[in-house]
């Protein structure tokens, strides 16, 4: 298959969730962890997950599904609060394809509940409450791709040990200070 930049959220959305790209990506991450955990020099009882944006979502989802993860690091995670995003009708950010999908394939609104239910299976919020590991969570207040309110909703669902780093003047971008926080977080003794 060829590379793509649009449609990752909506491919397979009107069909079975098993046909959705992000569903397959999540399964791939679990398979990869199983492979890496079998390496001789890997301590498979103390895995760490890290990601930003889509990777931030995958870090949380993966950590919730793999009980060997002891630390999860997530910066402005994507894939959250789909109903809120869909109702905002934002066409220009990372979630824009939801609006386009609705306008092209759900013109009457008849299928809204079905495709939001399918997205519910991928919603990072639903995985956050199942985290058992320590979490370092970066929130960017000015982010247009992963709005602050969706990031906060994920964070508020986490019941395990957690620490947030709030960056009031940052968008969806590299945050050098967060890199320092990651190092400190990984060096902490629990």
For each predicted feature, which ranges?
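Hydrolase active-site cap/lid region
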Residues: 61-108
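Glycine-rich nucleophile elbow surrounding the catalytic serine of serine-hydrolase chemistry
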Residues: 51-61
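Active-site nucleophile elbow and catalytic-triad environment of alpha/beta-hydrolase enzymes
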Residues: 111-127
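Alpha/beta-hydrolase-fold catalytic nucleophile elbow
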Residues: 50-52, 75-76, 167-168
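Short beta-strand/loop motif that positions the catalytic acidic residue
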Residues: 131, 137-139
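C-terminal catalytic histidine-bearing segment of alpha/beta-hydrolase fold enzymes
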Residues: 145-148, 152-190
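Alpha/beta-hydrolase fold nucleophile elbow
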Residues: 41-53
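Cap/lid segment of the alpha/beta-hydrolase catalytic domain
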Residues: 1-27
